[in-house]
Amino acid sequence: MIKKLSIQPASGLQGDLSVPGDKSVSHRGLILGAISQGTTTLHHFLPAADCLSTLTALQKLGVPIKRVDTTVTISGRGLRGLTQPQQPLDMGNAGTATRLLTGLLAGQPFETTLVGDTSLSQRPMERVRQPLQAMGAQVQLTAGHLPMTITGRTLHGSRTEMQVASAQVKSALILAALQADQASTIIEKLPTRDHTERLLQQFGGQIETAPDQRTITVQPQPALVGQSLTIPGDFSSAAFFVTAATIIPNSHVRLTNVGLNPTRTGFLNILRRMGGQVTVDHEHRMGEPVGTLDVRFAQLHPVQVTATEIPAVIDELPLVALLAATANGISTISGAAELRVKETDRIATIVTELQKLGVRITSQPDGFVIDGRKSWRQPTEPLASHGDHRIGMMMAIAALRLAAPAELESAEAVNISYPTFFEDLARLSQGV
């Protein structure tokens, strides 16, 4: 397992790349396949640590699942067919799976305990416990965190006004609502990624989103039906190469079959406002909108990103910071306090790591201010992922722009979401 890598400067990125399957869709496809009737096949599944934690947890809940490389076959057990695991479910670092399974297990007729690694055990779970409790669920936390014990009970339809803009919490409530005694309504604070809603409709679920894109009604579901799905390429993974091609001169990269769900692509809107050279072509559908991203090097302008944009760019905010660090002025990102409760306090880790390069960046309670006009310098200490996959990949991209090689510590963190990241980066840059 990699611990430390030396990353060489790149004179330009060139080539075509198909990124791995979408992490969010892989999690959700596994879960919906598990509670459907019949067989579900997932093609282009993401075999990263987080998704494998979900797969293993479902197997321990009695779901027969077979995986061959990126193809997964699930023998669905139906909505009421899960069985009590023999021991606590170890969710590793998988925050998405933990919150989604909490909603699912809240209506199952047995008790389950979920545990996780050090990082996951520090992430807030009260946000999912409270609305589930209002539906009649019994969820016991440890000081607001994992370990968490869920005692399945009869759930009641409810009307929930969400206090945080979180697709994970919304999805937990949707999975609980499928098992309730009557319809449930979920009102989002801001629209968030809608993979669960789209997939649930494909599996035969009755779910409706109002024109305001914030009000969701879920009907109790007697049965879902297994599907054959091809998972699109992960937009968040593609965004690393979009960023690299944008900030490294002499770059031209094409990224194929990338998922372009509009609730995920806020990053492209921000990049274009900054003067980025990215176009979309070969658009089609694979259950979700998909297309090819064509990206070239560009000189960037500063940008202001505010709270209403955050849900559609939450995973790409480290990259927005990196782009801003090359822009010809002062950029501000605000309304992003959610970054503080990700795998790390990402506001703190972004500031720490970019300051190693001499970037003028200061933290705010809910974001940061970045002046990109100062030239970068060679770091005097190793760059670090802090065990956070997105910080590790961000700094690997940043290192390509330096004048001399740089070391990246804890590089293995990329396995959480993108195990082949460094191989793909090397193909395009010859820089690792």
UniProtKB/Swiss-Prot annotation:
It is found in: Cytoplasm. Keywords: Amino-acid biosynthesis, Aromatic amino acid biosynthesis, Cytoplasm, Transferase. Phosphoenolpyruvate binds at residues 23, 95, 123, 168, 346, 390. GO terms for cellular component: cytoplasm. Pathway: Metabolic intermediate biosynthesis; chorismate biosynthesis; chorismate from D-erythrose 4-phosphate and phosphoenolpyruvate: step 6/7. Its EC number is 2.5.1.19. The keyword Acetylation does not apply. 3-phosphoshikimate binds at residues 23-24, 28, 166, 168, 315, 342. It is an enzyme of class 2 (transferase). Its main location: cytoplasm. The keyword Transferase applies. The active site is at 315 (proton acceptor). Catalyzes the transfer of the enolpyruvyl moiety of phosphoenolpyruvate (PEP) to the 5-hydroxyl of shikimate-3-phosphate (S3P) to produce enolpyruvyl shikimate-3-phosphate and inorganic phosphate. This is 3-phosphoshikimate 1-carboxyvinyltransferase.
